Regions:
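Active-site activation/catalytic loop segments of kinase-like enzymes and analogous catalytic loops
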Residues: 55-99, 114-133
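Secondary-structure capping and boundary motifs in well-ordered enzyme cores
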Residues: 18, 23, 50, 81, ...
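Long, compositionally biased intrinsically disordered regions
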Residues: 156-160
């Protein structure tokens, strides 16, 4: 896992991945929706915007959106990564982002894994440091968050081949529809 954690930054540093504007907190509650049309209006919480990899935003979205349980769920057997949600999000993402490079497309699953592991480490670090960064509403909440993220990483590893297969299928479908890729 150690090599994987550095892989995206190493690829950016080597020029293998393009530097893009990234939000870095791409979860659903950072999107405002129109109450009538239910269409997205804008993205909020812009304090985390900076240069980075599109894989950071994709990965964080998968971490949050494909999880089958709340981020602070205490019953870890409820937490896994939904392959159905992974597929639907990936389909939308590759079709909405036609400028993604082949290397970015190949690394989409790794983006999900890296961002999930990173969040787990951040939650654990915050718990150890006295819960100063992430707000908590109960004792041990950040530790529970760390546990769920690590469980999610383990589930991604178990489903790794299927994740790569889904990305390949969705990229191929998007290419056939003329809505994908450099």
């Amino acid at each position: 896992r150690q090599a994987e954690m550095a892989a995206l930054q190493n690829a950016l540093d080597a020029g293998e991945l393009p530097l893009r504007v990234t939000h870095n907190d791409t979860k659903l509650n950072n999107v405002l929706f129109d109450a009538k049309t239910r269409k997205a209006l804008c993205i909020i919480d812009l304090d985390t915007v900076m240069p980075g990899s599109a894989l950071y935003d994709y990965g964080d979205s998968i971490r949050f959106g494909a999880a089958t349980a709340a981020e602070d769920e205490r019953e870890l057997d409820k937490m896994e990564m939904s392959l159905e949600r992974f597929r639907v999000f990936t389909r939308g993402y590759v079709r909405a982002c036609p400028g993604l490079t082949q290397k970015e497309l190949e690394l989409l699953p790794l983006g999900a894994k890296v961002m999930t592991m990173e969040c787990g480490v951040r939650f654990l670090t915050d718990h150890i440091d006295g819960d100063n960064y992430f707000s908590i509403h109960r004792e041990g909440q950040n530790l529970d968050r760390a546990h769920t993220q690590f469980k999610l990483v383990t589930d991604m590893e178990r489903k790794w081949d299927k994740m790569k297969e889904i990305v390949n299928e969705e990229v191929q479908n998007a290419k056939e529809n003329g809505s994908c890729c450099i």
